[in-house]
Amino acid sequence: MSKRIYLILFIALISVSSTAVVIRYVELVPALTLAFWRMLSASLFLWCYSIKKPQRLISLNNRSRILFAGFFLGMHFALFFVGVRSTSVASATLLANTGPIFTSLLSRLSGQKVSKSVVLGLFISVFGIIIVQWSGYGAQGNNYWGNVFSLLSGFCIAMTYMFASKIRKDTENILYGRSVFFVAAVTILLVTILSGGSIFSFQNSDIVWFIFLGIVPSILGHNMLNYCIKYLSPTAVASIPLGEPIIASAFCYFLFFETVPVSALIGAPFVFCGIIMTVRNSMVD
C-alpha cells in the first residue's frame, strides 16, 4: 500500500473523529436534523465541484447499488447521531465502528472464505461488545437504546461499504460521493418526517456546523474512505475508523470534561483486539 493511501486514511480518521464532538456541542439541534444537513451539504459541495470538473454518468448496473448504499449510509448516520445523544461518546463510537465484524460476516455469507483467525476475532469482539452493552451503566434507560442504535449503525455502514466496493470498481469517487450522500440525505429526511421531527429545527448560528460536518467528517472523512475502498477490501476500510472512539473521547474529555465509562474501558480492549485480528486476516488487496 502506497504512502499516499496511508496519508489519506490518516486524514480520514482524524476527520471522522470530529463528528461526535460536534453532535455534543450543538445539543439543541435534533440529531436527525444534524444528520440530514450534514449529508445534504456534503452532496451539494461535491455537486458544485462537479460543475467545474464534469463527471461521467453512473452505469445502469450501479444505479440500484447506489440507492441501497445511500439508504444504508443514511440509516447509519441517523442511528449514530441518535446514539451519541443517548449514550456516551466512547460507547457510541465504539459500537458504531464494529463495521469490520459485519463486513467479514457479510463476505462469508456472499461465498467468500473466512479463516479461523477471523472467526476467533469476531468472537473476541462480540465478547467486548457484550461487556459494553450489558454493563450496569447501559442495561437500562437511554443508555441501552443509545448502544443498540450505535450497534445497528455499525451494521448499516458495513452494508454501505459492501455496495461501495462493487460500485467503486468502475465509478469515480466524486460521482459516487455526491450521489450516495444525496440518497442518504433523502433517507434521513424520510426518517425525520416519519418520526415527527423537522429538518428546520435549528438557529442561524448552527449553519456553520452543518457546513463543517459536510466538509470535514463527510468529504475529508467518509469520501476519502470511499476513495480507498477501490484499493482495499471493505473490511480493511471499515477498520480505519476504529481509532475514532479514542480520538473522539479524548476530544470530549478535554472539551466537555466527559467521563469515559469504566465498562467501555474494560470492553474496548476486547473489541479492538478482536477487530485487529479480524482485519489482519481479511485484507484481500
Label for each model-derived stretch:
Residues 15-29, 41, 78-87, 95, ...:
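Juxtamembrane C-cap of transmembrane helices in multi-pass membrane transport proteins
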Residues 51-90, 96, 131, 214-232:
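Specific transmembrane alpha-helical segments of multi-pass solute transporters/efflux pumps
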Residues 13, 43-46, 103-105, 109, ...:
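Transmembrane alpha-helical segments that form core, pore/gating elements
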Residues 1-36, 68-71, 75, 79, ...:
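Glycine-/small-residue-enriched transmembrane alpha-helix faces in small-molecule transporters
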